[in-house]
């Protein structure tokens, strides 16, 4: 699979617009795809069935792996089982490699302090008006960072599996990037590295690292925002998807012309992309492909499909909040979300991973009260009951590339 690197790393930065638009076809050809679409790796939502249907339909399938902890002996076996089930459902050796394994790569944080957990309990008791027994809440880190695996030398079995066994075409990272040595090793064995960016600063850093694809996550995107150079949401420029794509294309072209990078990574648009018109527009703005998430929330294979069995009113909106999980995330605005926002007074809360784990325990006990429905702008147009493959085929069949 090493040939993929040779095909992907093309000099596209100084192409004309027409030639640059051909990159969507190059993306498809290099990765053996029918459509320039990546099914987003939505933690807690994406299922193996969804990924398999996306792959069969001709898109890149994605499996979110933020729940795995390679420091534990059995978790590499969990990964192997997931991949095995995916391959069995795809049942086509020519397609099964069209897979993206996604990891969270945030900075390693300390365990929460007593003050942080006490503030959290006070906020939730006031917002939910229910008794919360702190003796029943465990502040465990439910989302271990890939950086922790690197730091503790816990990647040997994973790398061995990739080297000797199944190799996905893409491994991607959210909330940050792995070490240069990890990137180079994975590329050497023929795996493409994609990383999420939300700003031009992040794009510039990732391009210098030599990654293969930049997932440009616009502010309208649902789920957790993948920024890693901005710690305070007030410092986030909140670029829309199209503005981030345009500025990324320009930045990469300038870096290439100045000799700062030797090859230009693919530009992947992500955020607010709901149908073929949205996809066609992003491709016309020189994106090489798109990553679609919210549009699949109502699909029959989605773990979130029950939330979309009945249509939302047009008045229902989304909010970007960082006080549920500990990181900014776009969620559907519900009475619970509004109460938490109203009651929060800037108190210090537990860090991401620990706070999110505590919330999930409360949600399990009070599912009707603690609802955190991650979705992007345009979620009102989510189709309910459609299968993932049918959704992709419908979007793909109506695509317009180069005006055709």
Swiss-Prot record:
EC number(s) on file: 1.13.12.16
Cofactor descriptive note: Binds 1 FMN per subunit.
Binding site for substrate: 224
Domain of life: Eukaryota
Residues annotated as binding FMN: 41-43, 270-272, 293-294
GO cellular component: cytoplasm
Keyword field contains Flavoprotein: yes
CDD domains for the chain: NPD_like
Reactions it catalyzes: ethylnitronate + O2 = chemical entity + acetaldehyde + nitrite + H(+)
Keyword Flavoprotein: yes
Subcellular location: Cytoplasm
Alphabetized UniProt keyword annotations: Cytoplasm, Flavoprotein, FMN, Monooxygenase, Oxidoreductase
Class in the EC hierarchy, top level: oxidoreductase
Active site positions: 224 (proton acceptor)
Molecular function (Gene Ontology), one example: nitronate monooxygenase activity
Xref: InterPro entries: Aldolase_TIM (IPR013785), NMO (IPR004136)
Primary residence: cytoplasm
SUPFAM superfamilies membership: Inosine monophosphate dehydrogenase (IMPDH)
Gene3D superfamilies referenced in this protein's UniProt entry, alphabetically: Aldolase class I
Cofactor requirements of the protein: FMN
Family the UniProt entry places it in: Belongs to the nitronate monooxygenase family. NMO class I subfamily.
Function: Catalyzes the oxidation of alkyl nitronates to produce the corresponding carbonyl compounds and nitrites.
Remaining remarks: Present with 172 molecules/cell in log phase SD medium.
PANTHER family: NITRONATE MONOOXYGENASE-RELATED
Name recorded for this polypeptide: Putative nitronate monooxygenase
